[in-house]
């Protein structure tokens, strides 16, 4: 029997994304965003939803660009700190000894130590209530070679951090189950 719950954000875990922006003084800033995902295949696009009160929100509105750096689990403490501190008050990259790198494709920085980077130009902005959704066309991807298998990002090598709003916890990725799109007949 199923139990009814009040509406909430308790979907499946989502990756911890570190959103990189520049402020008006060209200072790099990063923040974690739990709300985001792929929203289109062609052109490849993602979205991140940020509260207007965040420092990064204003930066994205000004620069019309952002990056998403996907941290591996060995950077859990840094990612957690980045999600708590505000770029208005401190230099989070300096505090965590992480290295900002200027994207050569968009007006935003990424974190060099993180294995997978998505470089995005803003193509749509939609206010949804408490959050603003920034849809970014992925104009470039950078990946550490050791995080790839056959030229593609490998989840087991990247070891991304997942956030679950249901239990308010960080999680890791389990093992690969099977190749997708192979069940051509109804299961018995």
Where are these regions (language model features)?
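Basic, polyanion-binding surface patches
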Residues: 1-188
């Amino acid at each position: 029997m199923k139990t009814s719950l009040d509406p909430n954000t308790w979907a499946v875990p989502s990756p911890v994304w570190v959103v990189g922006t520049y402020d008006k003084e060209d200072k790099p800033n990063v923040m974690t965003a739990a709300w985001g995902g792929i929203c289109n295949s062609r052109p490849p696009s993602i979205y991140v939803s940020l509260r207007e009160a965040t420092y990064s929100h204003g930066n994205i509105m000004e620069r019309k660009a952002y990056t998403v750096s996907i941290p591996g689990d060995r950077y859990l403490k840094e990612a957690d700190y980045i999600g708590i501190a505000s770029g208005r008050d401190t230099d989070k990259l300096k505090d965590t000894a992480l290295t900002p790198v200027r994207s050569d494709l968009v007006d935003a920085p990424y974190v060099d130590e993180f294995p997978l980077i998505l470089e995005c130009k803003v193509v749509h902005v939609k206010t949804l209530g408490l959050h603003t959704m920034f849809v970014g066309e992925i104009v470039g991807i950078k990946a550490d070679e050791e995080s790839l298998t056959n030229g593609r990002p490998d989840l087991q090598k990247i070891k991304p951090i997942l956030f679950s709003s249901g239990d308010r916890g960080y999680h890791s990725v389990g093992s690969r189950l099977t190749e997708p799109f192979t069940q051509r007949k109804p299961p018995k």
